[in-house]
């Protein structure tokens, strides 16, 4: 066994190496035009929706491998991630390769991090912490918007948090598309549970009102400690989705995002100026870059 491979096995045994650890896992090699990598043969998120994501290693630096089937999804994710390479708050694409069956994305690894779905399930969030998370999320989404893209699948599973620094990163750009503010969209590429009511009722949506809706859904679910997430069907059934343990302005923000009538929903550009976030701009530092600086790696 080579020394890099031995180092990688130590990474896999480290309890801080994400929340799924496999001490006896096998390791395989994979080569690109630039580097030799070692990759775990068992998914990081076994049994979930991300059984195509694996932990890897290159010269002492942990990385993440994501396999995307060429039969199911075209290579748009690579194009989008390259375009967003220097965007604060967006997970970095380090390198890309492919084989006959898969697009293979090699992505930065954020140590001591977890997705927001598991974070809010296992930790009861106080309003101030949840508010800071939501505010960061909005800033990142607007950064993506400024680059001419819409993520298309904003949900707590696609947001990871550095547990120590409380800094957010957006991941999984498989549903991202070019921004088109004026034309209705008839195909839903994101997660059905986060679909907006206009698509449910009429079969179309506009990108920005959909984004506001999904932000509202994430905001609701951040307060769902040890409980299943709320989704559109729960709201349409008339269930009370407004958290009890937040301020009136917090409740109003969620209500404004989750208004059934898209024309009365909070505007995309008005998100950061909502009264709930008053004074937060001074408190939140600019979104810092986590992990290794991989700028200009992708050409």
Swiss-Prot record:
Keyword Coiled coil set for record: no
Keywords from the named record: ATP-binding, Host cytoplasm, Kinase, Nucleotide-binding, Serine/threonine-protein kinase, Transferase, Virion
Cross-referenced InterPro entries: Kinase-like_dom_sf, PIM_Ser/Thr_kinase, Prot_kinase_dom, Ser/Thr_kinase_AS, Ser/Thr_kinase_asfivir
Database matches in Pfam families: Pkinase
Domain Protein kinase: 39-277
UniProt-listed Enzyme Commission number(s): 2.7.11.1
Reactions accelerated catalytically: L-seryl-[protein] + ATP = O-phospho-L-seryl-[protein] + ADP + H(+); L-threonyl-[protein] + ATP = O-phospho-L-threonyl-[protein] + ADP + H(+)
A GO-annotated cellular component: host cell cytoplasm
GO molecular function terms noted in the UniProt entry: ATP binding; protein serine kinase activity; protein serine/threonine kinase activity
Binding site for ATP: 45-53, 66
Keyword Nucleotide-binding applies: yes
Induction of the gene: Expressed in the late phase of the viral replicative cycle.
Residues of the active site: 153 (proton acceptor)
One BP annotation, GO: viral process
Location in or out of the cell: Virion; Host cytoplasm
Coiled coil (UniProt feature): none
Family in the record: Belongs to the protein kinase superfamily. Ser/Thr protein kinase family.
Function (record text): Essential for viral replication. It may mediate the virus progression through DNA replication.
Protein name per Swiss-Prot or TrEMBL: Serine/threonine-protein kinase 1
UniProt source species: African swine fever virus (isolate Tick/Malawi/Lil 20-1/1983)
Organism taxonomic ancestry: Viruses, Varidnaviria, Bamfordvirae, Nucleocytoviricota, Pokkesviricetes
